[in-house]
């Protein structure tokens, strides 16, 4: 759109143009968008000026996200630019039902800035819709990824601590490439024959760990929704097996299902 005669362009057309910029924006367009913002801010119409302010706010937010994402990539790259680094994380340690799931992800950490994956963070801080969108992107862009699980019966037999470590170990060992380094969230992975560094709050610092947390979360949530189709009384489709009041009351009323962790129910039954 040519904005040289901005005063003659209707507000709705300008708004449509502004919305399109936000949807299709790439960082290479930054200078062009800044020029557009300047023109909108000089318009005599208050609603057009507000569009310029909103576009400026969008641009600032984009730059903040670019910086945050670059920091997460650089956090991993500091271990070695030519290293294959795997991030590994688990989900489902605490639920009363279902498996514990882990994912390991190897990303190309040397990819050009604008080819990086944006909006990645701790999976718990993302909406379900955003996690599912990022899950697809991570799988497409990853050099390798692998998902592993330990079921509820094994958790009962071996304990949650063993199962937690085992599922992380399986996720890493199932990768199609052997990483030079494994970054794990919070604590080290025992009996792993690959160099391992554990990062406190790693899913908010490491792009590789955060990516693995998203894949693991989406995979497990999908599993629990499938289980819910035959066990709808427990509400697995929205509680994912965690001990909500609704879930606890359902266990007391209907008894445990085939996917419940009996060792977690001693204070309920």
Curated annotation (Swiss-Prot):
It is found in: Cytoplasm. Its cofactor is Mn(2+); Mg(2+). SUPFAM superfamilies: Ribonuclease H-like (SSF53098). Manganese or magnesium. Binds 1 divalent metal ion per monomer in the absence of substrate. May bind a second metal ion after substrate binding. It holds the Pfam family RNase_HII. GO terms for biological process: DNA replication, removal of RNA primer; mismatch repair. Residues 83-269 form the RNase H type-2 domain. InterPro entries: RNase_HII, RNase_HII/HIII, RNase_HII/HIII_dom, RNaseH-like_sf, RNaseH_sf. Disulfide bonds: none annotated. It is an enzyme of class 3 (hydrolase). It catalyses: Endonucleolytic cleavage to 5'-phosphomonoester. Its EC number is 3.1.26.4. A divalent metal cation binds at residues 89-90, 185. Transmembrane segments: none annotated. One of its GO terms (cellular component) is ribonuclease H2 complex. GO terms for molecular function: manganese ion binding; RNA binding; RNA-DNA hybrid ribonuclease activity. Keywords: Cytoplasm, Endonuclease, Hydrolase, Manganese, Metal-binding, Nuclease. The keyword Lyase does not apply. Belongs to the RNase HII family. Endonuclease that specifically degrades the RNA of RNA-DNA hybrids. This is Ribonuclease HII. It comes from Clostridium botulinum (strain Hall / ATCC 3502 / NCTC 13319 / Type A). The gene is rnhB.
């Amino acid at each position: 759109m040519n904005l040289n005669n901005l005063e003659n362009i209707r507000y709705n057309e300008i708004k449509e143009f502004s919305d399109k910029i936000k949807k299709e924006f790439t960082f290479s367009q930054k200078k062009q968008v800044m020029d557009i913002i300047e023109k909108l801010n000089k318009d005599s119409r208050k609603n057009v000026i507000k569009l310029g302010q909103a576009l400026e706010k969008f641009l600032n937010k984009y730059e903040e996200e670019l910086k945050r994402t670059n920091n997460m990539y650089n956090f991993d790259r500091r271990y070695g630019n030519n290293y294959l680094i795997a991030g590994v994380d688990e989900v489902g340690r605490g639920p009363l039902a279902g498996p514990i799931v882990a994912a390991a992800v190897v990303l190309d950490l040397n990819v050009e800035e604008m080819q990086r994956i944006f909006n990645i963070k701790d999976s718990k801080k993302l909406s379900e819709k955003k996690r599912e969108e990022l899950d697809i992107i991570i799988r497409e862009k990853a050099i390798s990824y692998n998902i592993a699980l330990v079921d509820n019966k094994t958790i009962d037999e071996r304990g949650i601590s063993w199962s937690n470590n085992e599922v992380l170990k399986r996720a890493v060992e199932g990768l199609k490439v052997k990483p030079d380094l494994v970054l794990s969230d919070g604590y080290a992975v025992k009996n792993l024959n690959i160099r391992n560094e554990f990062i406190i709050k790693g899913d908010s610092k490491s792009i590789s760990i955060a990516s693995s947390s998203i894949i693991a979360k989406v995979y497990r949530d999908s599993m629990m929704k499938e289980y819910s189709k035959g066990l709808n009384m427990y509400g697995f489709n929205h509680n994912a097996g965690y001990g909500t009041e609704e879930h606890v009351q359902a266990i007391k009323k209907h008894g445990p299902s085939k996917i419940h962790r009996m060792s977690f129910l001693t204070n309920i039954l």
